[in-house]
A protein has these predicted regions:
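Flexible, P/S/T/G-rich "lid" or insertion loops adjacent to the active sites of thioester-utilizing
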Residues: 1-21, 111, 219
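AMP-binding/adenylate-forming catalytic domain of the ANL superfamily
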Residues: 204-220
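Short amphipathic C-terminal alpha-helix that caps PH/PH-like domains
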Residues: 85-92, 191-205
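Low-complexity, glycine/alanine/valine/leucine- and proline-rich hydrophobic stretches
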Residues: 143-172, 181
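Residue-level signal for inorganic ion chemistry
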Residues: 99, 164, 191
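His-Asp-centered acyl/peptidyl-transfer active-site segments
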Residues: 15-24, 28, 38-151, 183-188, ...
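Histidine-centered acyl-transfer/condensation active-site motif
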Residues: 3, 21-23, 167-190, 195
Length: 220
């Protein structure tokens, strides 16, 4: 787990509020730009996990209602950072309307339509989940300033090379980046490297949203 302090987290949240985007969009932009920087390809896909409990009936249904879909982005280096983020936002809004579709059926269909040379290969290097559990709001004060705590636990089964969960800490509203990974596929050193550049890309983009992706990659 990597911890981002409260003050820099607030800078990211302020950017999201100013430009009317979710932090999930900014995280996805940072991740796909990191892979674009590392691999030199404009076409990057990341699995996006969605906690789908849209109705009261679903909220009380029990069990797991997590759906995962690949989110593909194709941005050349001359695209402005903010324009790419807006594109991600609009495409997410379009995709999430269908988030109740069975992801297992989708991946089975894709494997038949676009077969890989051997089993186990995929287009996506990792998966992302953002848990928007920011409860530092006035509502808690109205209820007597109820204290709460959260903790992230892996379930012991890592079926993919890398899975990132980003959550807010209840004590200061900073961000925790929790990586679940297969140790033979991704090392701790590689995770540190990715986290370092992910943050640099997000902050550079938030500070200079008019810069192009290529300019940000050079600056970080």
């Amino acid at each position: 787990i990597f911890h981002l302090e409260a003050e820099p987290t607030k800078r990211l949240m302020d950017f999201c509020e100013k430009y009317h985007i979710s932090l999930a969009c900014l995280l996805l932009m940072g991740i796909r730009t990191f892979f674009q920087k590392e691999n030199g390809f404009d076409d990057v896909s990341v699995n996006n996990a969605i906690a789908r409990r849209a109705t009261l009936k679903e909220k009380k249904s029990g069990g797991t209602r997590i759906h995962s879909f690949p989110f593909r982005t194709c941005f050349s280096k001359d695209v402005r950072f903010i324009d790419a983020v807006y594109t991600i936002r609009d495409k997410q809004n379009e995709l999430f309307r269908h988030a109740n579709y069975n992801p297992t059926e989708y991946f089975a269909l894709r494997s038949k339509t676009y077969p890989q040379p051997k089993a186990g290969l995929t287009y996506e290097p990792m998966s992302l989940t953002y848990q928007p559990m920011t409860l530092k709001e006035k509502g808690l004060n109205d209820l007597g300033d109820i204290k709460y705590k959260t903790k992230w636990y892996p379930n012991g089964m890592t079926t993919q090379a890398m899975y990132l969960t980003v959550m807010h800490r209840p004590e200061d509203n900073g961000l925790d980046f929790s990586f679940e990974h297969q140790v033979k596929a991704v090392s701790r050193k590689q995770l540190e490297y990715m986290y370092y550049y992910l943050c640099k890309i997000m902050f550079k983009g938030a500070e200079n949203p008019e810069l192009t992706i290529g300019e940000i990659i050079k600056l970080v």
